Design a protein with these regions (language model features):
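Core segments of small alpha/beta cavity-forming domains
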Residues: 1-60
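Extracytoplasmic/secreted envelope proteins and their assembly/folding machinery
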Residues: 6, 10, 63, 91-95
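Intrinsically disordered, low-complexity acidic Ser/Thr-rich regulatory segments
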Residues: 39, 44-54, 119-146
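Short structured motifs
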Residues: 59-63, 136-138
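Residue-level signal for tight coil/turn positions that link beta-strands
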Residues: 68-72, 159
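A short hydrophobic beta-strand element
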Residues: 71-81
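Beta-strand elements of well-folded, non-transmembrane domains
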Residues: 79-85, 157
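Short beta-strand edge/turn micro-motifs at domain boundaries
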Residues: 93-124, 141-169
Length: 169
């Protein structure tokens, strides 16, 4: 989870577990902003932000108990988790920030559009708003409440690999 690598998570957790955690949804919402059309600065800021929120999602994790029974094992863990349920990563904040930026930098952006075209204009906007947008979003996610986590993970051996098949909180 800390690496924000859904592909790796899919190798160790069942689809039911992943869908219940909403990690894939969060990652997908943010990954839409890593396309080339957004420009290098915006993509880099998006990736940095994405890694930061996934890194802070679960902290102070401690294994409290392990019970093995053949091809099934349960692991009880405690720790802390951020509650991002009220934090939105949708396009509305992006649109609002972009609109404000365009209004404040009309002359400069008009020149870029005239001399370099629409694509350069859009990248200039994204480059300009990236620090503003991600600073605001960072403050929002850092202020998200931290909750105590107590969970029991169920792991099952399938095809010689241990897969997380359940999480009970």
């Amino acid at each position: 989870v800390k690496e924000c690598d859904i592909t790796k998570l899919k190798k160790v957790a069942s689809e039911d577990v992943l869908s219940g955690m909403d990690l894939e949804k969060m990652e997908k919402e943010l990954s839409q902003y890593t396309e080339e059309e957004y420009g290098k600065v915006f993509v880099d800021e998006t990736n940095k932000f994405k890694k930061a929120i996934f890194k802070d999602l679960f902290t102070d994790i401690k294994i409290k108990d392990i019970k093995a029974d053949g091809d099934k094992t349960t692991v009880k863990v405690t720790g802390k988790q951020k509650d991002y349920s009220q934090v939105s990563f949708d396009q509305s904040e992006l649109n609002t920030t972009a609109q404000q930026y365009v209004e404040e930098h009309q002359d400069e952006l008009a020149k870029v559009y005239k001399e370099e075209g629409l694509s350069a204009y859009q990248i200039k906007v994204y480059d300009g708003i990236a620090p503003i947008l991600y600073q605001s979003m960072t403050e929002t996610y850092k202020s998200a409440p931290t909750e105590k986590l107590t969970a029991t993970f169920t792991l099952e051996k399938k095809n010689d690999k241990w897969i997380i098949t359940g999480i009970d909180e």
